[in-house]
Design a protein with these regions (language model features):
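Domain-length accessory/inserted modules outside core catalytic folds
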Residues: 1-92
């Protein structure tokens, strides 16, 4: 299971089709494009985002950006588009 955080603040629980791990295709469908994985050491999990989200001018995701900055306080980066937060063991 993972949480899908949308730019408008909605949080949805999502589950892998095979009930074990998310496939690449599933992750790409959740973020609407190629994926980028960000390891979140403080939270001991990962964030999956759209690799080309900024280039595609996807909307700013405040909640996902807050999670990023909690894990990387010196970062000046930000998250756009949908973001999936999941345990590393949920990824294929």
């Amino acid at each position: 299971m993972a949480n899908l955080h949308t730019p408008d603040g909605e949080i949805k629980k999502v589950f892998p089709i095979n009930e074990d791990t998310f496939s690449l295709q599933e992750l790409q469908s959740f973020v609407d494009g190629y994926i980028e994985k960000i390891v979140l050491p403080v939270d001991k999990c990962s964030m999956i985002i759209n690799e080309e989200g900024k280039k595609e001018k996807l909307p700013y995701n405040k909640f996902a950006t807050q999670i990023l900055l909690k894990n990387y306080p010196k970062s000046e980066d930000y998250i756009v588009g949908n973001a999936i937060i999941c345990a590393n063991s949920d990824l294929a």
